[in-house]
Design a protein with these regions (language model features):
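Helix N-cap at the start of a conserved alpha-helix in ABC-type nucleotide-binding domains
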Residues: 140-142
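Conserved signature/switch motifs of ABC ATPase nucleotide-binding domains
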Residues: 103, 124, 156
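Conserved ABC transporter NBD signature motif
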Residues: 16-31
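H-loop/switch region of ABC-family ATPase nucleotide-binding domains
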Residues: 164-165
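Conserved ABC ATPase signature
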Residues: 104-108, 112
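Short coil-to-helix segment of the ABC ATPase nucleotide-binding domain corresponding to the Q-loop/switch region
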Residues: 63-71
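Catalytic Walker B motif of ABC-type/P-loop ATPase nucleotide-binding domains
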Residues: 129-132
């Protein structure tokens, strides 16, 4: 989890280097020795290229599924709302949650909420998806529906970094497995 949070600079690493898609993230130290990003615009660019799916979903409870998915494309990427809605509906179909597009997160199961979180990340058209234990907060019977979506993304050739305890899944869909 800390590794993923360092990749998108939600946590600032104290040493080492981060390179995403060949771009080295420039860091510097202040007069107290604290590390911080040298260029905030570079950090913004990085974050639009990395889709993060959190363990606890982090959906906005006051928004519908559809509103959750279009929020970032409309406000960050400046995608026209009509285009964002069309894209979001296609993604919701893909992750198998379209029929719940007008529901609020509190009316969804954990597996459904996690699929919405995946859809929200996909809506930003990221170069890479970061999954922070995407099934650990789910009831065992709901794990399969989330793994199915992730397996489909892997089969499409999506670059994903997944922190998981689902070792069988990791071995099955990964090109490389790293134990930390």
């Amino acid at each position: 989890s800390t590794f993923l949070r360092c990749l998108n600079l939600l946590e600032i690493p104290t040493s080492g280097k981060i390179s995403v898609s060949g771009e080295l993230i420039r860091m510097k130290k202040d007069r107290y020795g604290e590390t911080f990003p040298e260029d905030n615009k570079q950090v913004e660019r990085l974050r639009t290229r990395l889709g993060m799916v959190f363990q606890q979903f982090n959906l906005w409870s006051h928004m519908t599924v559809l509103e959750n998915v279009i929020e970032a494309p409309v406000h960050v990427l400046k995608t026209p709302k009509k285009e964002a809605l069309e894209q979001a509906e296609a993604i919701l179909h893909k992750v198998g949650i379209f029929e719940r597009k007008d529901y609020h997160p509190g009316h969804l199961s954990g597996g459904q909420q996690q699929r919405v979180a995946i859809a929200r990340a996909l809506a930003m058209e990221p170069d890479m998806l970061l999954f922070d234990e995407p099934t650990s907060a789910l009831d065992p019977e709901l794990v399969g529906e989330v793994l199915r979506v992730m397996r489909q993304l892997a089969e499409e050739g999506r670059t994903m970094i997944v922190v998981t305890h689902e070792m069988g899944f990791a071995r099955e869909v990964s090109s490389r497995v790293v134990f930390l």
